[in-house]
Each structure stands twice: as structure tokens, then as C-alpha cells.
Amino acid sequence: MPEAGPEAEPGSPRKKIFVKTYGCQMNVYDSARMVDVMAPSGYTEVDAPEDADIVILNTCHIREKAAEKVYSELGRLRELKKEKSGRGEELLIGVAGCVAQAEGEEMRRRAPVVDLVLGPQTYHRLPEYVARLANGGPGIVETEFPVDDKFASLPMAEKRKTLARGATAFLTIQEGCDKFCTFCVVPYTRGSEFSRPVARILDEARSLVDAGVREITLLGQNVNAWHGEDQAGRPATLGYLIRALAEIEGLARLRYTTSHPRDMDEELIAAHRDVPALMPYLHLPVQSGSDRILAAMNRRHDADSYHRIIGRIRAAKPDIALSSDFIVGFPGETEADFEATLDLIRTVGFAQAYSFKYSPRPGTPAATEEDQVPEEVKSERLQRLQALLGEQQLAFNAGCAGRTMPVLFDRRGRGESQLVGRSPYLQSVHIDDAPEHLFGSLVDVVIEEGHRNSLRGRLREEAAVLA
């Protein structure tokens, strides 16, 4: 077992930690757990690096130039560290996450201001590392893959912290990926697939619900590859886990992301039909509509199999809102390949989507392909693709006008007395003149307008709090 960091002495001054998060929802979860794991050592979270004794950059390596953005931020932190040193104050600087995993020792060589480099599977040892550095120890680089050890060592979040984070929460149930898509760094930065045991997931979910969370999003790089054992010791998949979580009293909503088409099994599809708490929304990345490009990406499915999966899902849950990821300009992509992607979008119809220009990631097979698509072609294709997706998203949102939906209010809006919540379909819903007591509640809302990126509505007369 790793050495634990020191417990804070009663009455000792609270130290402060600032974590800046880049990238995906899993990093949001990881950042929150870093704060949790430092709490027993006397650290409290602050909103600005200037106020902190420790600054952690929790990084993402998916997009191009991710590392350079981190080094740029480290340049600013170097100046802050100098300022603090001039006032007799110390500042420890750490880099965590996937850029840290990929860069390793190179990060401390290029940026000596960094005291600590730790990969995504080692942040549970943060108190130990900080204690060693505080005692004058040398800089630390730790990029091992002890995934099970990490989750077994994480404390439950304090109730007050969970309350402060709101009525929605992320819960990581799976990490890593074994698919090895040729464009993706995840298998190299997050490691092979690992699934958390059912009991630990249920314990964490109950803790969140006890603290006021009403909606939990299950996270994984390949979340529907999660597997475990049911109460009888038989193999279980995500559909079983969702049913078990839905039995937790007080948990109103469940979601999960991100999925792979290869792992959409019948039990999971049936859960969409049978479990009321599972929201009618599915993010199922396809990346391309061209079979040739899908094969080059090593996606292990073709366009037709994706269509068949969508057909089974819609048969089980006719009102489901579909979301996806698309990459344009993958090496070798022709105009015909791109048109096949547009055809798939027109045929399926998406309520929401995320789209990107292909960016070579060092160490991935696609990065060394010779037939890279010119940048101007990528940009032009992305513009066309996003225009089509935007039309579909607007049509879906506009079609919600006149409907009454249960909305979970989890944010305060920009305007006075404005609240923002989530519909079952993950749309942002804005209402004005909202009573403050509805924050964190699930309430029926009449949708009046549907815009491209949000809905606007009003409370139903005599609307009661649903949860």
C-alpha cells in the first residue's frame, strides 16, 4: 500500500489547492477526487491559482497541441511561483492526467518549475507525494497504471463538498480502452480496460445520493465495456449495473457516456426500454459514415452495423435522443468518403453531436500515414458537416416546443432569478423568475421555445417538485 500523507493537526491553518481541468468529463471527476483525497491533509479547494499552496493542471491529450497549451500555462505559473517566493510563500506545481502520462520525465526537463508529474492512475497518492515534496524531496514523476489500487484508495467525498457541487454528479465506473482506434491516444495514456466492482460503485452512488445528488452520469472511456459480477457471482454487464443503481432510493436519473457501438448489447438496449431512471439520451460515437475510413480507423464496425444498432435502440426507446462524434479529414478521406458521412447523418438524425478536424496524435498509427488531408480541406468539410448537424439539432429542439418536461435545475443563469436545468434529453432549459428553492429540484416545465443550443420554458402552473 502507498504511504499516506499526514493528517492535518486540529486547529492548524487550512492549506489551499487549485485544480484546473482540461478535457473530458472523466477529468472533471478526477479533479474533484484529487480535492477529496487532499482534504484529510488539511487542504481546501480555492477558485484561483493565486490563492493556492498547490496548483494541479489536470490535462487532456485528445486534441492537437494539447501539450503546448499546458506548457504555456506552466509559463504563467512559473511567474506566479516567483512572485510567491518573493513574498516568502511556497507554491507546489503539479501536472496530472493524460498529457502528464504521455510526457513523463520530458515534462520536468522542459518545465523545471513542475514539482510533480502524475498520470491518471496515480492521483490517489497525491498526499504522499505532496508530503515528500514539502519535506524537501526531489521532483516526482509517477506514471504507473495501478488502476485498482487507485479506486480502492479513494475516500468518499465529504457531504458538504458534494452538496456544493450540485444536484448532478459524475461517477467513473470504467477506465481505459482495448479498442486501439488508430487515431486515439487513450489506450496509451489511460491503459487497458478496467471495470470497478459493483459494490464499490453502489457505495459511491449511495454516498452521492445521500448528499443530495439526483442525477448520476456513469463515466468510462468505453463505458459500455464495463463488466462485473451480479449478486449470484454470474458475469454482468452495464445493463445489469444500471438496473441495480436504479433501485437506490432518491436517485431520479441515470446517464452513461462514452459508448462504443461494438459493446451495445441487448441487455443494455433493454435497460433503455425498462428502466425509467435511465434518461432517453445516448451518446454513441460513429466517427465516419465511410466503411473504408472506419476500417482505416480500426473501429471494428461498419456503417450498416451502426444503422442496425440504432434501429434496435429506437425500437426499444422510440423517443431516444441520439448524439455522436465525428472526425473529418482522417488520412485518406476522399470527398466520396465525406459524403458517406453526411448521408449517415441525414439517415440517422442526431439531436446533438460533437465534430472535429482530424489531428495527428504522436504515437498513434494514423499519425504516420502519408495521405494526410490538407488543412483547408478539413476546415471546409467541418463547416459543411457542422451546418448539417446544426440544422438537425435546431429541428430537434424546436420540436420540443409545447411539450411539458421534467427538468432538473442544476445551474443559476446569467439573469436575476434565472435557473438553468437539464431536460431528459440533456438539453439546457432556461426559465426566468424562478423561485430559488427550486435549485437542485426536478420540476415540470412547459417548453415555449427551442433554439439551437438550448430550450426556454416556464414553470407549469402549480408545478410540484418531482424529486
Curated annotation (Swiss-Prot):
Q: Where is the MTTase N-terminal domain?
A: 15-135
Task: Cite the Gene3D superfamilies for this sequence.
Answer: Methylthiotransferase, N-terminal domain (3.40.50.12160), tm_1862 like domain (3.80.30.20)
Cited SMART domains: Elp3
Give the similarity note: Belongs to the methylthiotransferase family. MiaB subfamily.
Which residues participate in [4Fe-4S] cluster 1 binding?
Answer: 24, 60, 98
Q: Which domain of life is it from?
A: Bacteria
Locate the TRAM domain: which residues?
398-461
Under the GO molecular function aspect, what terms does this record hold? 4 iron, 4 sulfur cluster binding; metal ion binding; N6-isopentenyladenosine methylthiotransferase activity
Gene Ontology cellular component terms for the protein in this record:
cytosol
Question: Cellular location of this protein?
Answer: Cytoplasm
Stated name of the protein: tRNA-2-methylthio-N(6)-dimethylallyladenosine synthase
EC numbers on record: 2.8.4.3
Q: Cite the binding residues for [4Fe-4S] cluster 2.
A: 177, 181, 184
Subunit (UniProt):
Monomer.
Sorted keywords for this record are:
4Fe-4S, Cytoplasm, Iron, Iron-sulfur, Metal-binding, S-adenosyl-L-methionine, Transferase, tRNA processing
Kindly state which reaction or reactions the protein catalyses.
N(6)-dimethylallyladenosine(37) in tRNA + (sulfur carrier)-SH + AH2 + 2 S-adenosyl-L-methionine = 2-methylsulfanyl-N(6)-dimethylallyladenosine(37) in tRNA + (sulfur carrier)-H + 5'-deoxyadenosine + L-methionine + A + S-adenosyl-L-homocysteine + 2 H(+)
What PROSITE patterns would the database entry show?
Answer: MTTASE_N, MTTASE_RADICAL, RADICAL_SAM, TRAM
Q: What is the documented function of this protein?
A: Catalyzes the methylthiolation of N6-(dimethylallyl)adenosine (i(6)A), leading to the formation of 2-methylthio-N6-(dimethylallyl)adenosine (ms(2)i(6)A) at position 37 in tRNAs that read codons beginning with uridine.
Q: Which InterPro entries match?
A: Elp3/MiaA/NifB-like_rSAM, Methylthiotransferase, Methylthiotransferase_CS, Methylthiotransferase_N, Methylthiotransferase_N_sf, MiaB_methiolase, rSAM, rSAM_horseshoe
Its cofactor is: [4Fe-4S] cluster
Domain (Radical SAM core) ranges: 163-395
Keyword Transferase on this protein? Answer: yes
